[in-house]
Amino acid sequence: MKISEKKFNLWFNAFILVGMLLAVVVTNVYKFQQPGARHFMLLLASVGALTGVINTVLSANGNILTFLFGLIDVTIASYVAFDSSIRPGGDPVWGNFALHAFYFLPMQFVGWWQWRKRGASSKKKVRARRLDGRQWAMLSAAFAAGTVTAYLILCAVGGSPETEGFIRTVILFDALVLVLNILGQVLMSLAFMEQWVVWILVNIFSICLWGGKALSSPDSSYTVVMVIKYIFYFLNSLNGLRIWYGLSRGER
């Protein structure tokens, strides 16, 4: 029996949202019992994780309300990254903090404005489009140059002789996530289908970044929620690529 597009999206979105809710509840129950668990940070990261998933589900479906939930998500993510960077024993993720606080946050308003110009509303999907060859070349060049620049800057700011090998690995993933998020947000705001290729990479590197933090800093209880969050983001980004491929067919 063939499942309709509308029904598939409904069930997939429900799976992502319900699955994320259950994962957060189970994680909280477990982590609250651990000695030294930081309850406030755990709950805050959980709220951010849930609003972030709603944000990405709406984005995958071309709904402009994605920017409302995105505003909540990036505000919380900014605080989580800041706390991780300044807390004694925490890992420096200043690139992640700068990304959310000084770029992602204002870009929610830019994206809302741009999607409105392309016909999006709470009931009408945005008119998606695709990159041409020249735009792909520009995107690739920006990624290469941005990654090298971000890595060198973050190494200079966050390098540590005592833990150089581990810290520099964290900084590499931090730089990759930083640059990919910047490029992905631009593509998202301008309604390009190829944003989802970028988001898939962002989610893979983010899982590695926060997974490494969870293993190296067991007292950072909220990092587990961040790992789960990006796993669901990854699944949703695959569906987003599928949906936007159809939305952008024949568009430039």
Regions found by a protein language model. Give the residues of each.
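N-terminal membrane topogenic signal
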Residues: 1-18, 133-138
